[in-house]
Amino acid sequence: LWYSVARIEGLGKPHSFFYQVAGAKFGGSFDVPAFGPESYQQPGVPSGTLSEKIIHTSKIYDGMRSEYWIYVPAEYKPDAPAALMVFQDGGAYTDRNGNNPTLNVIDNLIAEKKIPVMICVFINPGDITDSPGTPTYNFVKGYGDKWQRTLKDSMRSTLYDTVSDRYVRYLRDEVLAEVASKYNIRKDSYSRAITGLSSGGICSFNAAWQMPDQFSRVVSWIGSFESIQWKEDPAIPDGGQDYPEKVLHEDKRNIRVWLQDGSNDLDVRYGNWPLANLRLATALKFKEYDFHLSFGDGTHSTAHGAAEFPEEMTWLWRDYDPTKTTQNYEMDPAEKTRPTFRVAITNR
């Protein structure tokens, strides 16, 4: 005899479940997304247009080839500059019927006027295979050989996990320059957001941290604020694990940040993902950043972030005024009244 007992959670959040037989738990999942209506195509809401795949060859990364897509909402008008949002691991966000129905959310929130009309750039990590002998190739190949990682995976880590301004310069000077030659995009960071998952999460935070004049709004899912590229390049002293201290001790950046993670995220030789995200959130709170931490019990998965993406976007773009080019981001008054984050051991 099989039976199930379920507690129905709200839409826009992930569900978890398990099976129990003779008093013993087995199977199940922490990450079953429960998409709300804003994650589905709605009657009467116009759909934007996703471009064909575009290939870019980088100078900053010595011939690395990247692919990206441009999403243009139906409301875009060439004579009105649009806001901008850049998605790392971009191909993961482009399927309306997939695990990350991002395009549906963007269409619906623009129609509801919860976010501005925005051009979205979905960019994948690059491939250095065709540029042997270049400094970038040699570094990436050496890193991959050292840690038994593929050339493509090592290129992604070099792009995303390195704590420097190189990647955001690549976006600014190469990719977004191409996009801006085709579409009317706002140049003020007040109108620019960036997001990613895992290493793409720290990459997005790092881009805004390094150049807050380019991006001021950040969403990080299961961000890898860890030591993945720490000391791999002797010229770069910091690793991702250093960001809590950088936030506490360096000049405050005018950025707005949403962090998402779960208690069952990774704990490996590079570090502990839940603790790293909690440490960063605590640092942001102490410095009174405009931030939000959404912390559940999920794993290293997009389920939590994707399920609440409408909420994330609404929060990220709240009080946006297209007549402005700047805003001094301040911590939400409700967050100021809340205590700092505490940690408890739950598995032993």
Regions found by a protein language model. Give the residues of each.
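Non-catalytic cap/lid and distal C-terminal segments of serine-dependent acyl enzymes
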Residues: 1-348
